[in-house]
Curated annotation (Swiss-Prot):
It is found in: Cytoplasm. Transmembrane segments: none annotated. The keyword Ligase does not apply. This is Phosphoglycerate kinase. The gene is pgk. ATP binds at residues 201, 323, 353-356.
Amino acid sequence: MGWKTLDDMDLQGKSVLTRVDINVPMEDGKVTDDTRIRRLVPTISDLLSKGAKPVLLAHFGRPKGKVVPEMSLQPLVPALEAAFGAPVMFVADCRGPAAKGAVDALAPGQILLLENTRFYPGEEQNDADLAKEMAALGDIYCNDAFSAAHRAHASTEALARLLPACAGRLMEAELKALEGSLATPERPVTAVVGGAKVSTKLDLLGNLVAKVDTLVIGGGMANTFLAAQGIDVGKSLCEHDMTGTAKDIMARAEAAGCTILLPSDVVVAREFKAGADNETVPADACPADAMILDAGPASVAAISTVFAESKTLIWNGPLGAFEIAPFDIATNTAAQKAAELTKAGQLISVAGGGDTVAALNQAGAAEAFSYISTAGGAFLEWMEGKVLPGVAALQT
C-alpha cells in the first residue's frame, strides 16, 4: 500500500489544507485533555519549517449539518497556540469568500483554523460540491486524521481526490504501526481482545484468527467462550445467544492454526463493586451465585509466557473489570509484562480503543508500548480488515 507523505511534496509558499482531529473534551470553554492536539505538533512544525501555510480542517461534535454555536472551533484557538507555539487565526467558515480571504491574508509562520466542517450537511454526505469549495482554499491536501479515516466525508475523502494529497506525520506513523502489526508483522503475533461483548467484536475476531498465531480472549467475552464449551459461568456477564458464534470462531481458529487462549482460572465475586469479597477458582468452577470479574493468576502467567514468546502484540480491550480494584490485576499485570518486553526490545506492541488506552494508562504501561492508537473506530475497522475511505483516497 503506497501513499505520499510530506517528504514527497513541494511545500514552500503553499497553502496546505490539513485535515486534523481536534475533537477534544472540553469543560467551561477550556480543553481538558489536549492529547489529540499535541499529536499534531510534528505535522504542523514540519509545514511551518518548510514555508507552508497550514490551513486546518476539522469537525467537532455532531451538529448534524447545522450551525451550532456551542460546537464552534473558535474556543480551541488558545490550546492550539499553546501546543504549536505559533499564532492561530480563526475564520467562521470552511468555504467561500470569507475563508478564501483568511487564507490569502495568512502571513508566514501563522496557522489558520477553519470553522467546523460538520456545520454543512454536505460534509457527512461526502458532497462533491462542498469538497470543491474546500479545495479552492488550498494547493495541497494533507490528511493527519487517521481517527476520522473510516468515514467517507467531504473533508476526508472527496477533497483528497481534488488536490495533490499526502499523509501527515501522525497518519504516517499510525499506518506504519498498523501495517507492521497486521499486514507484515514479525512473527509470532499475539492479539489480546477483551471487553464485554463478543457481538461488538465479531468482525475483529473473525479477521484476527486468520492473521495471528495466538488470540488471548479476556473480559466479559471470555465468559461467552467458556459457556460455549459447556462451562457454567454462574451470574457472569455472558451472551448466551452468542455461544454458537463463539464455537464457530474457535473452529475457524483451529483451521487457521491460531491458538485461542482462554482463562484457566478466574476471580469471582458476588457483588460488582470495588473491594468486593472475592476468590480465585478454576474457570470451570464458578459458583452459581457468583460472577467472573477477572482472569486469575495462572491465566495471567500463561498470557505472560505467550507474550515472552511473541515478536508482535496487538491489544484491544481489558482482561477484566479493570475500572474497579482488585479486578484490574490481570489487565495491569499483563500490560506491565508487555511494557517490560517492549522496553527490552523483544516485542513490538500496538494498542488501540478507548477502554484499552485507559486501561494501559492505569497500569502505567502506555508510555512503553511501541504505538498507541487514539483512533477508536478507525483502529477497530482497520483491525477488522476493512478499507478505510480516508486512507484509500491517499493511495497512489
